[in-house]
From Swiss-Prot:
UniProt keyword list: Ribonucleoprotein, Ribosomal protein, RNA-binding, rRNA-binding
Domain of life: Bacteria
Molecular functions per Gene Ontology: small ribosomal subunit rRNA binding; structural constituent of ribosome
Cited function: Binds as a heterodimer with protein bS6 to the central domain of the 16S rRNA, where it helps stabilize the platform of the 30S subunit.
Family designation: Belongs to the bacterial ribosomal protein bS18 family.
Organism this protein belongs to: Alteromonas mediterranea (strain DSM 17117 / CIP 110805 / LMG 28347 / Deep ecotype)
Record bears the keyword Nuclease: no
Name of the encoding gene: rpsR
Full protein name: Small ribosomal subunit protein bS18
InterPro entries assigned: Ribosomal_bS18, Ribosomal_bS18_CS, Ribosomal_bS18_sf
The UniProt record lists the keyword Transferase: no
Alphabetized Gene3D superfamilies for the sequence: Ribosomal protein S18
Length: 75
């Protein structure tokens, strides 16, 4: 019988040795928001608490400066 194994979640920022998450790095921030514009929780992404706080504040700062949208484009 086949068993399904889930991949172990790990914090990419800890593994790469990132000291601070930059709000201008839009490519990285887009990986942590949904299509509708919500911030993805750390239990889904595996991000540690320290970097999840930095990530959420960076996303909010990028939204305020209009680098990221608050919601998806309504068509």
């Amino acid at each position: 019988m086949a068993r399904f194994f889930r991949r172990r979640k790990f914090c990419r920022f800890t593994a790469e040795g990132v000291t601070e998450i930059d709000y201008k790095d839009i490519a990285t921030l887009k990986n942590y928001i949904t299509e509708s514009g919500k911030i993805v929780p750390s239990r889904i992404t595996g991000t540690s608490a320290k970097y999840q706080r930095q990530l959420s504040s960076a996303i909010k700062r990028a939204r305020f400066l209009a680098l990221l949208p608050y919601t998806d484009s309504h068509k």
